[in-house]
Amino acid sequence: VLLIDQVFKQPNWSSELRKCHDLFPNLKIIFTGSSVMRLKEENPELNGIVKSYNLRGFSFREFLNLQTGNDFRPYSLGEILNNHEHIIKTILPKVSPLKYFHDYIHHGFYPFFLEHRNFSENLLKTMNMMTEVDILLIKQIELKYLHKIKKLFYLLAVEGPKAPNISNLADEIQTSRATVMNYIKYLADARLINIIYPVGEEFPKKPTKVMMHNSNLMYAIYPITIDDQELMETFFVNSLWKDHIVNQANKDHFYIADGEKHFRICDAHGEQKIRFSPDTIYARYNTEVGKENQIPLWLFGFLY
């Protein structure tokens, strides 16, 4: 078995792996790359011989299992929507999810929490590596432009989840609007941000919302005032992002999954003013239980 980490640092790596595959048929090769890579599209010599696996951060379910010693299984979105009340009844006798939910939101997505070292410092180092190595090296961007990408990421982070003003961002980092859009796409490919579009639209059009890829990143960037609603929407989008397409609906706090399922993320403690609609699924935070089309937000962390 040949194990290779960050294979993209080796020049002509894909053709060399192909030679190894052809010359040593009994050799098993395992290599790591980057989410910025377009593995099959940009490396045709590997077509048909490589199986790729996308390694994501921990889901809330995985974090909960690690912290409590339980072995809760994942559920599909359909199972959660149609059977959430029964699912919750199998979980609550064993654990109180809300006791662990804030810890997950703060530091549970990345495995650094398992190490007895400074979590924020490790995360900042990883964020730097994503920009300095993954984006610059793989996209072949000159080092002199690194500060522009980092500044753009910071500006997007402190603005919070909203539609980016591309013209203002271009002025801030002194580059063209087209380059800003490319940088935004690179940051999304590096899993530092999520870009949200209306149904039927995608890059290179301007997104209706840019948000951090996961809630842990929001705590790592300073100074930033973290809003609970923004944290919970970031968690929701990140939880669905693995296997579902998430689009922006026509109102704040509303999202559309897979082009048909309408969601609203809301606080269970502040719902007196909400008119509940049978056509909307309410993902409610600050509660452990749900009913009918009102589902506790934490349960969407059981999607993988």
Label every model-predicted segment.
Residues 15-19, 273-276:
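A short acidic, amphipathic alpha-helical/loop segment
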Residues 1, 24-30, 260:
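Loop/turn-to-beta-strand initiation segments
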Residues 236, 240, 253-269:
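Conserved catalytic cores of phosphodiester-cleaving nucleases, focusing on short active-site segments
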Residues 1-13:
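Conserved P-loop NTPase "ATPase switch" module shared by AAA+ and STAND
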Residues 34, 40-147:
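Interdomain motor-coupling "hinge/lid" segment immediately C-terminal to the ATP-binding subdomain
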Residues 246-251, 266-304:
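Catalytic cores of nucleic-acid endonucleases
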Residues 110-250:
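Accessory nucleic acid-recognition modules appended to NTPase machines
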